[in-house]
Regions:
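Long, low-complexity, charged/polar intrinsically disordered regions in eukaryotic proteins
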Residues: 1-31
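Long, charge-rich, low-complexity alpha-helical segments
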Residues: 32-98
Length: 98
């Protein structure tokens, strides 16, 4: 895994990692007990779009479109979030899409 998640990398949850909604909270957890709690609505949407079929850039573009947000800022925030998820061992980075 690289130090920072690249915009052209394809994120997907690692095997055994899932995202669950509990009431108003969304929790990402894995079999080893690592959890990430308190995701805001845009972070939840990023997680939902990380299905192994889209680049990080296309995930950010979709979120920016859905939430009418600045695309550059959403890309920056998305890459930071994905880098954190990768460091926690919650997502895998697939090959770059060319």
């Amino acid at each position: 895994m690289s130090a920072d998640f690249g915009a052209d990398r394809v994120p997907r949850p690692r095997e055994g990692v899932s995202g669950e909604r509990f009431g108003s909270d969304f929790i990402v957890l894995d079999a080893d007990g690592r959890t990430l709690r308190g995701l805001n609505a845009t972070a939840v949407r990023v997680w939902q779009l990380c299905d192994g079929t889209r680049t990080a850039r296309s995930v950010a573009e979709q979120v920016a479109k859905e939430y009418s947000m600045d695309a550059r800022q959403v890309l920056t925030d998305t890459l930071r979030f994905l880098t954190d998820l990768a460091r926690l061992g919650l997502i895998d980075e697939l090959q770059e899409v060319r």
